[in-house]
Design a protein with these regions (language model features):
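Short beta-strand-to-loop capping motifs
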Residues: 76-80, 203
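N-terminal regions immediately upstream of nucleotidyltransferase
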Residues: 1-69, 80-90
């Protein structure tokens, strides 16, 4: 059987954000934080606090496919409201306008006032989402533009996933990234948070073999969804993220997962690394590296064996 673990490790490198992109994101984030603090101060309001959250904080962000944008979440936590009755909190539409006014003009594109955040779009191919929160009595409330203040705890989800990685293995983080890259390339109707939960709850460690860990994890996800097509958020408000999915959507997701599982089986059972990698390229795209044809690999092995220094006997001659 071909050993394609090293190909998966190279794939992980190719889908991971570069240091340059990471630094650019941090610079943009810090600039927005500065503008928001200044706007709040200039308008007689307590300066908010911030929390890096989402896939960037969990180190599971992947480079997007084609011209798609990648994004980060930076939570804006309003100060001065924790001791108030929630009925006295400002309207969610009001706090959205505050943050939008603070960041307008920071980029050429207008910021977008979405239901759950203010989105700032950058010409470099990424955007920063700014969800707004109030924390009270160990609960965190999100400013949803149409639903009002709703319970949502992104920090708890981040901590949940980080603990999952600690309890299991760093391999889990890589598998989440592989599956995110897969769903982007194959246009599978799953969100990043859903993939993160499914992979974490069904993770099968296989030390030194990401391809086998991924195969077993995908099979476990399939078994779980065929038993009950649910994906509960592990932190408040503990909702089923698959609520309302149509039968067709569920079938499409399961069929895509089964196709991935078959490709992994074929790749793992294949003797030729090049053929094995082609199965994976069909699922992950051209960012997955090509393996070396078996005859070339064997020739290199034979050459290395032939040109290896001989074992010396006690008299100094080659054995």
């Amino acid at each position: 059987m071909a050993d394609i673990h090293n190909l998966f490790m190279s794939f992980n490198d190719s889908i991971t954000l570069s240091d340059a992109k990471t630094n650019s994101l941090r610079t943009s984030r810090n600039s927005l934080r500065k503008e928001i603090k200044e706007w709040f101060g200039d308008n007689g309001k307590q300066k908010p606090k911030f929390c890096w959250q989402g896939s960037f904080a969990m180190k599971t962000t992947v480079n997007p496919v084609g011209g798609s944008e990648y994004d980060i979440d930076d939570g804006v936590y309003l100060s001065g409201y924790s001791e108030m009755d929630s009925s006295d909190w400002p309207a969610t539409t009001t706090v959205h306008n505050w943050v939008k006014n603070a960041v307008d003009g920071q980029t050429k594109a207008d910021s977008i006032n979405k239901d759950t955040c203010i989105r700032v779009v950058y010409a470099s191919g990424y955007h920063i989402d700014l969800p707004i929160y109030i924390e009270q009595n160990d609960s965190i409330y999100l400013a949803h533009k149409s639903k009002g203040w709703v319970i949502s705890d992104p920090k708890a989800f981040r901590d949940w996933f980080i603990q999952k990685v600690k309890d299991n293995d760093e391999q889990l983080r890589r598998l989440v990234k592989y599956l995110k890259a897969w769903k982007d390339y194959k246009a599978v109707s799953l969100k990043g948070i859903e993939i993160t939960i499914l992979a974490s709850n069904n993770f099968c460690v296989y030390e030194g073999h990401d391809e086998k860990s991924l195969r077993d994890t995908v099979q476990s996800i399939i078994d779980s969804l065929e038993n009950s097509f649910i994906c509960y958020k592990p932190v408040a408000p503990y909702e089923n993220l698959f609520e309302g999915f149509s039968k067709t959507k569920k079938e499409n997701i399961l069929n895509s997962l089964k196709s991935l599982k078959r490709a992994l089986d074929n790749a793992i059972n294949e003797e030729d690394p090049l053929t094995a990698s082609n199965y994976m390229i069909n699922e992950f795209g051209s960012r997955f590296p090509k393996g070396e044809a078996l005859d070339q690999a064997e020739a290199k092995t034979a050459y290395a064996r032939t040109n290896a220094p001989g074992v010396l006997k006690h008299d100094g001659r080659s054995a």
